C-alpha cells in the first residue's frame, strides 16, 4: 500500500517524463510488476476525491492498460499509457474545477 501511494503521488504530481521514470524506479526497487501496480492503483483511485467523469475515464483507461498487459504487450509502452491516463485525469480535474 505504501508503494502504491508513492506511485499515485508521482503520477498525480509529476510531469509526464518524471512520472514515468519515477514509477519505473519504484517498480524496480520493490520488484513490482506493472499489472500489480495497476490493480492496486485502481483500488486507490476509488479513495481519491476526483470528479466522477475524471474517475470514470481514469479507471477505464487503467482497465485498458491491465487488459493489454494480460496479452503480453510491451510493459514500458503500457507504463507510458498509464502515465498518460493520469495526465488526462489531472486535466479533467482542472476542467471540472474551472466549470
Task: List each language-model region with its residue ranges.
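Helix-rich C-terminal "collar"/helical-bundle subdomain used as an assembly and partner-interaction module
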Residues: 7-99
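Long, charge-dense, solvent-exposed interaction surfaces that engage phosphate-rich ligands
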Residues: 1-4
Amino acid at each position: 500500500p505504501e508503494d502504491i501511494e508513492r506511485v499515485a503521488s508521482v503520477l498525480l504530481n509529476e510531469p509526464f517524463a518524471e512520472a514515468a521514470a519515477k514509477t519505473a524506479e519504484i517498480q524496480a526497487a520493490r520488484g513490482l510488476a506493472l499489472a500489480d501496480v495497476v490493480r492496486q492503483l485502481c483500488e486507490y483511485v476509488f479513495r481519491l476525491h476526483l470528479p466522477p467523469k475524471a474517475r470514470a475515464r481514469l479507471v477505464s483507461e487503467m482497465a485498458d492498460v491491465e487488459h493489454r498487459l494480460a496479452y503480453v504487450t510491451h510493459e514500458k509502452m503500457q507504463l507510458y499509457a498509464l502515465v498518460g491516463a493520469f495526465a488526462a485525469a489531472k486535466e479533467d480535474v482542472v476542467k471540472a474545477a474551472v466549470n
